[in-house]
Amino acid sequence: MNNPKMPMFKFLILGLSFTSSLCMAQQALVDQAIKAMGGLSKLESIHTLQYKASMKQWEPEQSFEAGGEMKFASNSNFEVKRNFDEGLVQVDWVKNFVYPTTRTYTFSEVVRPNAGYIAGIESNTRVKQNKESDPPGHTMSSVRLAVAHREFARSSALLLIEMKRHPLRVQACADVLIDGVSYSALKYVLNDQRNDQVFTVIFDSTTKLPLRVRTLDYDNIHGDVTYDLVFREWGQWGGVILPSKMSYEFDGRLISDVDVKDYQLNPALSEANFSIPAKLLSSAAKPAVGMINFQWPIRRQIIGTLIDSDNNAFDMQAVSDLALTPLAPGVDHQSRGSANSLIVEMKDHLVVFDAPTTDWQSKRTIELIQTKYVGKPIKYLILTHHHMDHAGGFRAYAAIGATLVVGSSNVAHFKKMLNAPYTLNPDLQGGSLARTKIIEVKDVFKDSDGSREVSAWLLENTHAKGMLFGYVSDVQIGFVTDLWAPGRDQIKGKLNATQSQLAKAVEKAGLKPLLFAGGHGQTAPYSQISEAQ
C-alpha cells in the first residue's frame, strides 16, 4: 500500500542531509584554518595578547588629481593589548602625520564592550570634551565605538574560534575571485541580534589560512566598496601561527600597510590598561546600531582630522545644528559644520557651492534652503574640487535634479561616481543618478539672470587639479575652499603658497572681491589677502 506521506518524508530527509553536508563543508574550512594556525587547543589557550607594530597609510580621496596617486598620510608606531575574555582593547599610538600638515600625535585608545575612550590628542578637530578635559581626553562617539568593535573583530587572532563557537552565524558563500584566482569563502555575522555587520572570510587554498577578511562598505565618493584586511605574511609565536604583515585595501587599493614586530601570548595585563575615567564613563556612548558609514571615521583617522561625533558634519557636543548665515541679500553661508557651502539666490533658481562630508549634511542644507527660499529649485551644484570632505554629499543634490558643475579634468571622475551603486548609503536611498547633467569648467562658468551673475573660475594651484573658486559679482563676495580658510587662517606677513595662488587667480580674472567665505572657517575681508601680497 502506497503511503502518500513518504515522498514528502524522503524530500525532508534529503533536505536535511544537504543542509548537514553544507554545514559540514563550512565547518571544514574553519577547522582547516584553525589547524593551520596551530590547532584548536593552542588558539583556545590564548586569553590575552600583546604586540607592537608599525604602519604606513595613504588616503585615496585627497589626491591631487581625481582618481590619481593617493596622498601619503602618515607613519605610525603602535602597541596593542587585548583581553579576549573580557572584550577589552588598548592601543598606544605615536602617529607621525605628513598630510594635511606635519605633526605628531601621541595618544591611547581604549575599547570596551559598552564604551570607548581616547586619552590624549589624536586629531586636528578636537571635540569639546577633549578640549575641556585635563589631561586631554574624550569618550568615543557611538559610531566610532561601533567602527572600533568591527575592526578589532576583523583583526582578532581568535576570529576563527568565534566562528567555530557560533556556527549558526556562519553562512555559505560563493567563491571569491581575486586577481583571476578563485578562493573559498564564508560569511560570518558578527552579532546574533543584527545582520548588518558581516565579514566575508576568504581562505588560501594552499596554506588553508585566512587570506582576507572583507566587508562591503559605503564611501561618500565611490559608493558601495569593498574593504579588506589582507594577511600577507605569517610567523610562529609560541606554537601559534599569527600574521606578521597585513594590509588594508579600499576597493582594491592599498591604503594601510602594517608590519608586526612581536607577539606576546598571555601576558599579564592590568585592568588599569583598559580603564576609562569614572567621571566620563557614566555618560559614555554605547555602540551605534543600524546602517553606519564606516569609511568616514576610518579614513578621517588616516589623515588625523576625525571629528569624533555621531554627526560627521560637526561636533554634537558643541553645535546643535547647521545654519544659514546671511552675507548679503540672497547670499548665505552654510556654516557651523567642519566644512561649509555657499548658497546664492537667482530670480528663478538657486546655486550652491560645495556639498561637504555626507549626504546627511547635503539633505539638511537643502532643508534649510527650501525653508528660506520656498519653491525655488537648486539648479546648479558647483563643486570646488573632488576631495571627499567637500564633495561627499553630491548625491543628495543629484537626486533632486541639480546639474553638477566641476573643474576641468573632473567630469569623467564624477560620471563614474554617479553610475556607482550606493545601496549602503545610510543617508540616501534612491534610484539611478546616471542621468545627472555635468558641466565642465575649462576657464570660467557663468550663470546670470540679468541682475546677478554667479561665476566659477578655474584656478591653477597645488592642492587639487581642476580647482574652482566662486564669485557673486553684484555683492563682490567670493568663495574658496582649502586654499584659504577665511576667519580661521591668520595671515601674518607673506602669503603662503595656496593663498598666493588664490590671489593670482582673482587678479587674472579681474575681480574686485570685498569679502570671501570659506569651505572651511567663516568669512574675512579679501583685503587680508590683497594687502599681504
Show the residue positions of the predicted features.
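N-terminal mature ectodomain segment of secretory-pathway/periplasmic proteins
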Residues: 32-35, 40-127, 174
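Bacterial N-terminal signal peptides
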Residues: 10-21
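Conserved beta-strand hairpin/beta-sheet module of binuclear metal-dependent hydrolase folds
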Residues: 324-371, 467-486
